[in-house]
Amino acid sequence: MVLGMLVVLALSAPADAAYGPDLQSASVATSADETAIRKVIGDYAKAIETKDLELFKTVKPNLTLEEEKRARSAFASIQSQVVKITFLSIDMKEHQAVVKVTRRDTINGSIPGAFPQTFTMNKGRTGWVIAEIGR
């Protein structure tokens, strides 16, 4: 009976509640900058999930032509993708931040596994943006 209720609750939860980025850390109160950084990373995940190249360019405005080409190719080859981001650390120094996460994608219904990602971010006049994405 309990197992049945858990299955129903899991299935009735909104998709972004189950797979969206962990925008708030339960253990530490976040600063306005940390909250903004987490939102940008969340928008990055949303851009991938929704195949929204314009949103991708908003969070990573220095996107190169090669990166754009790879993104278009990936978006075209994947039917569905859910991106789960788990924040490991946010190291801020003035107008730069290094954000370490674990990312787990569900691609076309399959979970190929989790992998680390490191984002180098810059804060400009319009707020935080992704400068580099690495592993």
State each model region's role.
Residues S12-A13, I37, T120-N122:
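Intrinsically disordered, low-complexity regions enriched in Ser/Pro/Gly/Gln/His and often acidic
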Residues M92-R135:
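Exposed beta-sheet edge and beta->alpha loop/turn motif
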Residues M1-S31, V98:
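Juxtamembrane and targeting peptides
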